[in-house]
Structure formats: structure tokens, C-alpha cells
């Protein structure tokens, strides 16, 4: 019995999808009965692709014996034929693939007046989500984002294996990564290209900017942020916005660190927010002059040395230094106030 015409509803134009038939209305590898690839035209109407049907008549038509079948439809949203299922049962899906599914069970395959069987009402559902990153530059001398690229980690494992009995993609692991690009930046607010990502339950993502140029400042691999409690549902549309401000405040000819210095383990860092402070004499924020030790009474009365300067150790080393008397006086003389604090201090 030829099973060639199919009737789709609101599907994408110029895409190919594969149909897999399972006899006895049971979706198992043992009940595999055949497969064929169909292609939609510019109006979204589908027709069989030549030489893709198994089993097939001499004419190339897809042929199935009369009976009750379950049909599984899948596509990657492209104009290329989806690969046949491995073992007539499973395939893989990766990030940035527009994987779509449809399943119809209890289909009575029998001849109509034309001697064929029509599969009607095929409507695909997207199984991946769409994700876009947005970068907003603030408080730089020039806020134009000229170059931008990033890597997102913590996504669902990729590839993921899907089998024909599943109506959705499984959610597995947190080892997936995605490279994100910006085709046309050159603005203070720039949106990345849109990407497909596998669905995921709530988790924390890490976004590392591998390439970043704001104004004249090149900051490759210098900024990494976390996005918490991120859920990506099938067919959802998501945008993560990252605001980037300089980690310094310009006062006359010097750049002063925006955040307080603290020590964690053997490394030195600046606080993420200007108001943050590691309280307590031994909790990392109490740092003496010219020493890498922390705590009350820890200081070095000898000559200044970059090897002993905690500011100098902040990654990348050599970017910062403890201010000299002259530099501190320069800030005081500038008459700068911040949030109502005394002149020259904040």
C-alpha cells in the first residue's frame, strides 16, 4: 500500500523531515516497518524525496502493508535529509540544531479511493530553545562595543541521544558548551547571533568573553560572569543580558580600582561590587602595606617591592599597584566626591 502523500500544518518551508513507521502501533526497534524522507516546498507542503523510501515500489513510492501503525517524524529544520535512525531506533542532537518532532499513533493504514493512504495533520514541535546574549557597556570613556565573542559552559550535555519512543529530548548533564558570536557590534548595546540550545533544568551557566573590545580597551579572556537559575524549555526564547562597567574610576591621570581588595586562598581579587567588603581581620579584606599576609599587625616596613604588593598580584599581574603618597595626594587634590563621601575618598 503506497504511503506517499502527507498533509502538514504550518510547517517551515524548504525543510526535509524523516518519517519512520512502526507496525502493530508499537514504537520499538523490533517493530520497525520502514522509513522515507519528505521535503516541504515554499508553501510548507510536503512531498516524498526520490529514492529515500524503504520499502519501496518499483516506482519509488513508499509501501507498507495494511495495518495499524505508529509514525515518528523528526527534522533538523534544514533542507538536508535527516540521517536514518541508528538501529532503526535512535539518533543524536547537539546544541545549535533545530530539532523537531511529531508522533502519530494508532494510524490505520488502508487504501483510499486512489489506492493510497494519506498521513494528515502532521505538526512539528521544536525541542530546543533559542538563546541570545546581550552586552551593555556603561561608564567607559567610549562605550562602543567593537568586538565581542563568548563561550557559554554549563549547558546540557551535547550530543544527547534521543530514541523514537521519546516525545521530548532528554535533559542530561552540565558539560555542554556553546561558542557565541556577534556579527555586527559597534554599538553600546549589542545582541549576539541567535543560537539553538538543548533544553535544561535550572542550573548556573558560566559566560566567558573570549574576545571583547570596548572603546579602545581590549579585554580578551578578562571577564567571566555567572548566570544563575537558568531554565531552557523546549521552543522557548531566552536572552541573557550582561552589563559591563570598568573595574576602575578615572581620577585625573590615574585609574583607581572600583572594588575593594581581598585575598582568597593564595590569590588576590577585587570585589565584584563597589559596596562589597570581606569583613573581619582574618577574612581576606584586612591587608597591610607591602605584604601578602592578611590579618591584624601584618605589614612590611621595608622598601616597597612589587613582589610584596598585594595589588600587583591581582590577575593579570602587574596591572595594579598600591598607590604612593604622591598618587594618593593627587586624588585628594582632584576634589572628587562619590556618594557623599569626604572629598577625594570613596
Regions found by a protein language model. Give the residues of each.
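Conserved positions within compact, well-structured domain cores
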Residues: 245-346
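Extended serine/threonine-enriched, polar tracts that run as long, contiguous segments within proteins
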Residues: 152, 180-227
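Hydrophilic extracytoplasmic domains
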Residues: 215-251, 319-320, 337-344
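Solvent-exposed serine/threonine-rich low-complexity stretches and specific carbohydrate-binding patches
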Residues: 31-53, 161-185, 225-228
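Short, low-hydrophobicity acidic/polar segments
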Residues: 1-140, 191, 201, 211-213, ...
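Short helix-loop boundary/capping segments
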Residues: 100-119, 123-192, 203-204, 339-340
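Hydrophobic beta-strand residues in large extracellular and virion-surface proteins
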Residues: 17-19, 71, 148-152, 205-209, ...
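Generic recognition of long tandem-repeat/solenoid scaffolds
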Residues: 48-60, 180, 189-192, 257, ...
